[in-house]
């Protein structure tokens, strides 16, 4: 019985850790999901954005006390506007998705939500992109990746 409990806890800890992508692994993944050039945004800009928001980590969350909302996952999808975490007051859930889906290793739903956001608001919806990527040479974010 103890062995089953320990195994269960180990499996739980694996799912809770999330995934921290390597640079080129994420670049290939985002390209495969069709983000390279999506709505005019280059792959290097998406890479800069995800580095600035989460350091390529699917498990990152950040609470925003002013809006009582939380940003989730590799793209830091906000619970007030884009996903439902069940606790953010007056949440809109523009992507029609649970915020917990933004924290998964499989970033399919996170990418779909990011596409929705950029389609409606443009890349400037992300503060990290405005502060760290806009009007900068972002080529280093994909340099060395065999794409």
Swiss-Prot record:
SMART domains documented for this protein: LYZ1 (SM00263)
Disulfide bond entries: 24-145, 48-133, 83-99, 95-113
Enzyme class: hydrolase
Alphabetical list of CDD domains matching this protein: LYZ_C (cd16897)
Keywords from the UniProt entry: Antimicrobial, Bacteriolytic enzyme, Disulfide bond, Glycosidase, Hydrolase, Signal
GO molecular function, one term: lysozyme activity
SUPFAM superfamilies from the UniProt entry: Lysozyme-like (SSF53955)
GO biological process annotation, one example: killing of cells of another organism
InterPro entries: Glyco_hydro_22, Glyco_hydro_22_CS, Glyco_hydro_22_lys, Lysozyme-like_dom_sf
Signal sequence bounds: 1-18
Coiled coil residues, start to end: none
EC number(s) recorded for this UniProt protein: 3.2.1.17
Top-level taxon of the source organism: Eukaryota
Pfam families in the record: Lys (PF00062)
Residues the record marks as active site: 53, 71
Known catalytic reactions: Hydrolysis of (1->4)-beta-linkages between N-acetylmuramic acid and N-acetyl-D-glucosamine residues in a peptidoglycan and between N-acetyl-D-glucosamine residues in chitodextrins
Ranges where the C-type lysozyme domain occurs: 19-147
Function: Lysozymes have primarily a bacteriolytic function; those in tissues and body fluids are associated with the monocyte-macrophage system and enhance the activity of immunoagents.
Similarity-based family: Belongs to the glycosyl hydrolase 22 family.
Name of this chain's protein: Lysozyme C, intestinal isozyme
Organism field: Bos taurus
